[in-house]
Amino acid sequence: AVGGGSGAFGQVAQGFAERILHPSRLQDRELLRLLADMASCVGGEGFVRQQQAAMGRADTRNWLPGLHAPALVVCGREDQVTPLTLSQEMASLLPDAELVVVDEAGHMSILEQPDTVVAAVLRWLERVDAVRL
């Protein structure tokens, strides 16, 4: 189980893991242990504050067309928190963006498919560096 302890917070953390991870990763003990450690560091009160801050955050998509810098948008194909359609929208609004969709990943794509994400970031950095030279 995932969670920063037992009881209600442990149950919430477990349910959250089911929402942020690709179904194929729900039995990955190492990944679940990492999420449990992350949850433990934040604690129940911190977790609630994080969620409130995220839900209360202003919609800043209207700013994206004005950002004139290279951008890489990475999204897990099965991300339930930031669905692929939102990542596609974000990438389309940014003037110089590339979208990378990570298969067999949810919201935690960097933890679920680290080799794929790191390779994509390195390829993107090489392209950005080549353009600037």
Which role fits each region the language model picked out?
Residues G7-G66:
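Conserved alpha/beta-hydrolase catalytic His-Asp/Glu region
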Residues P95-L133:
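Catalytic active-site module of serine/aspartate enzymes centered on a nucleophile-bearing elbow/loop
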Residues G4, A39, D79-T82, G106-S109:
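Glycosyltransferase donor-binding loop in the core domain
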Residues T60, A69, P83-S92:
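Short alpha-helix in the alpha/beta-hydrolase fold that links the catalytic acid
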Residues G66-L67, V73-C75, D79:
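Short beta-strand/loop motif that positions the catalytic acidic residue
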Residues W63, P70-L72, P95-E98:
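Structural signature of beta-strand start/N-cap positions in the alpha/beta core
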Residues F16, Q51, M90, V117, ...:
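Hydrophobic "lid"/C-terminal helical patch
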